[in-house]
Amino acid sequence: MVMLWGCGCASHPPVLAKEPRKGETDMGFSFSAENVIPVIWFRRGLNRSTDIGLRIGLPLSGSGIDVNRILFRNGSRKWDALNLAYNVSPNSSFDLTYYKFKKAKKAKRGEMPSVSWIGFRGMFIPYGISKNQSQRFGILYGRRFGKRYGFELGYNHDFRSMPLSQIVNLNWDPK
């Protein structure tokens, strides 16, 4: 079981579910099933549409660098962003993720409104743990509650390892 998990793991940048501000730096920790050990991250706003991120994991697994760019704003509550990332892990990868964010209409007094998002990710692993290349595509959903807590769930599928039509087939034989 651990071998199956280890062969499939990769690392992804944590999303900062707010619009960037020039010169503002945010810091936090992310916990994931992929990395086991928490990863510390930093995000710095370059302007009102772009920020750059750095992640540091021990032992380097989960580390990486990424850049976010807001592509569209739809009023004060919705925006679309593109994230480009390089990740260091057993399956080091290049990621491209398209996010659609939506901020709640109102928040509790004195708190930040919650933000939810859906994302579409493409990932290229040039030299994975199994010594092969991999192209994965997936979908993810996330939500931030207030300023400190949030979650993200997703699925990335490697079409070379299993046909998409066989995901729910419990009798599928990879031979």
Across the structure, where does each feature detected by a protein language model lie?
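Outer-membrane beta-barrel transmembrane domain signature
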Residues: 15, 20, 89-175
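Outer-membrane beta-barrel "beta-signal"
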Residues: 8-9, 65-70, 166-175
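A short acidic, amphipathic alpha-helical/loop segment
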Residues: 40-42, 64-67, 95-98
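Beta-strand-rich domains and repeat architectures in extracellular enzymes and scaffolds
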Residues: 35-39
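Bacterial Sec signal peptide processing site at the extreme N-terminus
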Residues: 6-26
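Transmembrane beta-strand segments that form the barrel wall of outer-membrane beta-barrel proteins
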Residues: 23-34, 46-60, 65-89, 113-128, ...
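Sec-dependent N-terminal signal peptides
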Residues: 1-5
